C-alpha cells in the first residue's frame, strides 16, 4: 500500500474518531431524537473501506460516509494554497535550522524561529471549495452505483481562518471560532437540491473542536430561522520554532 493511501486512511480514521467522540444532540440540525441515536449507532460501527481507492471512504451496515476536505484559502489544480505553502514553509524552516545547527559550535544551543503570514481566506473561498468538492464526490457516488440506504458526506474544514457571528432575532450574537455551515442559508439551499442522493451532511473542524450535523431533507425548516450571520476572515501568522545542540560523538 502506498504512503499516500496510508496517509489518507489515517486522515479518514482520525476524522471518524473525532465524530464518534464529539457527536452530541446540540450539534445536530433537523434530526429527531431517534435519528440522532441512529446516527450515533452508525458512527460507532463505521469502518474504513478495505478498498482504499474506491468509493466510499467509510462504510457501515447499509450505509456509507464519504470524507473530503474543504478550505477557505484559494485553490488551484494542486489543491489548497494554504496547505501547500504551509508544507513548503515547514520543510524549508526545518532545512534552514538543520543547516544552522550543522555549522554551529559543538555544545552550542541553537534556537531559530521562522514566521510567515497566513494566506488570504474568505467566505467565498470556502463556499466555492464546498461546492466544487461536493459535486466531485457526487460524481464518484453516481459512478459507483452504490445502493446504500443511508448516505453521509463528511466534510473537514482544513483551516481555522474563518470565524462566524450568529445573531438570532432579539438576542445577542454568539461567536464561533470556525465556519458554521448551519447558518449559511444560501449554501444550504444549494445543498438541498441533492436531498435525493445524500441524507446527512457532517462538517468538522478538529482544530477548533467544531462539529455540525445537518439532515438535508430538513433544510427548508432550518433556513426559516430569523438570524443575521457574519463570516469574518482571521488574520495571523504561522510560526515554527526549533531548538537543538550539536554534541560530541
What are these regions (language model features)?
Residues 58, 63-69:
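Conserved catalytic cores of phosphodiester-cleaving nucleases, focusing on short active-site segments
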